[in-house]
Amino acid sequence: MFRRIVAVPSSWSSLQLFSTSAVRSSNGLAAILEQVSAKKSAPREAKTPSKYADRKPQHSSPVRKKKVFVRWTTGSEKAREIANTVVSEVLSIRSDGRLRLILPEENRIQELSMQDVARQLDLEVHSLRFIKSETDAGGRPLPLVKRVSVREAFRVHAERMAAEREKELLRKGVSARRVGAKERRAPDSKQVRISWQISPTDFSNQKSKEIRGHLERGHTVLVLLANKDASGPAPQVSPRELQRRSSLLDELAAILEDINCSVVRSGDPASRVELKLVPKAPQEVDRHALKEQRRLQRAEKLKRRLERRGPASAQE
């Protein structure tokens, strides 16, 4: 006798849970389908947790922020130094350089970047002064800066440096009385700008007197000799013009010889020259030498008096 064999599909050949009775019965195919369905619906065993499950997700490297660079094309070295001090304060509060700028002449406040301020500002006329830190509409800090004259910027900087110097001396143990009023009220610096095209008359009657007056009052004077339009590149200078500029510098040096001050010169007559004039403190007089000098003067007077009386007494 031949047995009837039910062919099992190849996809089910790996199943070993089918009973022979289910295959022999007429409803064998339906039973197989039920068993397959039950096999699929059976709950899966929980997988073993991976050893990398507790590993923290790796974050991408932070995006580097672009640094703000400010380049000044006008003004003296001291004026640039003062402006860079304000730039450092702004960048310490707002790394992208955004700020609010007060324009007193125009009676308005403008919000712009530090680079825009540097492009618009002429350090030979104006400078910057840090006021305070505010917040913008999004709650981020926003520095408030005021455009001021160069003279005011020099004055504020001198007062600030004097205050810092006093604090440093006090920190080192020097008493406030020893610091003295001179340290607490350091004289402000004055800036005198002279054009290379100035006439000899204007130089002798105006600029030289202005420089002398500042030095006699104890102020440090910054003298800037440059072209009237110093924003662009320096033009080519002829030998005759160089000689005239050298004569102007010699005349200024002759004026400074009569004044007790130190002179620090930098620059080139072909473009611009900067002079830093610092008045020297008056030398202290030696009291013992002065006393000896007065004693000798009294002795000399007495000797002359006796000489005048000598002939008169002899005649008597």
UniProtKB/Swiss-Prot annotation:
Residues 42-57 have a biased composition (Basic and acidic residues). GO terms for cellular component: mitochondrion. Keywords: Mitochondrion, Transit peptide. Residues 1-12 form a transit peptide. It is found in: Mitochondrion. Residues 40-64, 297-316 are annotated as: Disordered. Belongs to the AIM23 family. This is Altered inheritance of mitochondria protein 23, mitochondrial. The lineage of its organism: Eukaryota, Fungi, Dikarya, Ascomycota, Saccharomycotina. The gene is AIM23.
